[in-house]
């Protein structure tokens, strides 16, 4: 499986049928978020050469991915309608599974963490990724961008976003945006910046939580961003907006699983597709 966890890094991993890693590869990107077919090929080739009885290849990509492995749009990578699945299948003559990276990470939290069958997974890193499980079935939607809350505008007068709108959640609470604000700010302001971000996050979560009756929201990210300061503010705002006598309290928590959860989840997705097609 292949994932893009950081702006300057692409990772690949070969795993066994239990999702345990047997070989790991990392390459620095030539430019920030610059990924093309050759870059992905350079990661997969040594893994493929060193591994026997490969059942498939998994690609976890940031952005909107359809059921045919087409990356319809990735603002981080600057991709539109890239058929990465077909390109990799032709190169390696193996079945290829392509998922949104947040969806892949959610699979790991569901199977190896504390995630329940009705949950939302939110990742705060370069951008804001999201994925939803309902009755243990991933929600993809029509386009299919189900769970993607990063480009909901919470402040139409806010900072401009790469998608063309202003004040998107991604510009307000992503790790990249918050690190930039924290570095420019006085130490006394840092807690208030994280609390403000948590309030924005709780506001954005209130609609999907109320609409879908989700019991669990799992937030994944570095501990300098995803910590008690941010999460308690998000929880307070979510409670304020969704609390009622008939709606049990939805818990916002840090992701239980750590490490390369996207790679592991994508490997599990490859195994699922392999067994389903047998």
Task: Give the predicted meaning of each segment.
Residues 53, 57-60, 64-169, 271, ...:
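Phosphate-binding/catalytic loop of phosphoryl-transfer enzymes
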């Amino acid at each position: 499986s292949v994932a893009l966890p950081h702006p300057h890094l692409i990772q690949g991993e070969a795993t066994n049928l239990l999702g345990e890693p047997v070989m790991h590869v990392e390459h620095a990107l030539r430019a920030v978020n610059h990924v093309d077919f050759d870059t992905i090929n350079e990661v997969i080739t040594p893994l493929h050469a060193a591994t026997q009885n490969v059942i498939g290849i998994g690609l976890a990509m940031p952005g909107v991915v359809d059921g045919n492995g087409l990356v319809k749009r990735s603002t981080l990578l600057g991709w539109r309608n890239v058929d990465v699945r077909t390109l990799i299948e032709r190169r390696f003559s193996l079945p290829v599974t392509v998922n949104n990276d947040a969806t892949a990470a959610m699979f790991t939290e569901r199977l190896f963490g504390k995630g329940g069958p009705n949950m939302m997974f939110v990742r705060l890193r370069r951008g804001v990724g999201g994925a939803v499980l309902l009755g243990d079935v991933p929600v993809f939607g029509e386009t299919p961008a189900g769970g993607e809350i990063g480009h909901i505008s919470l402040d139409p007068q806010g900072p401009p976003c790469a998608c063309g709108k202003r004040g998107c959640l991604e510009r307000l609470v992503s790790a990249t945006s918050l690190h930039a604000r924290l570095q420019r700010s006085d130490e006394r302001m840092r807690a208030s910046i994280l609390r403000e971000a948590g309030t924005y996050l709780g506001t954005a979560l209130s609609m999907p939580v109320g609409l879908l009756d989700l019991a669990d929201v799992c937030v994944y990210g570095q501990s300098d961003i995803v910590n008690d300061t941010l999460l308690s503010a998000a929880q307070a705002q979510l409670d304020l907006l969704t609390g009622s006598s008939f709606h049990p309290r939805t818990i916002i928590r840090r992701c239980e699983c750590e490490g390369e959860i996207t790679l592991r989840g994508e490997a599990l997705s490859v195994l699922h597709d392999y067994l389903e097609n047998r």
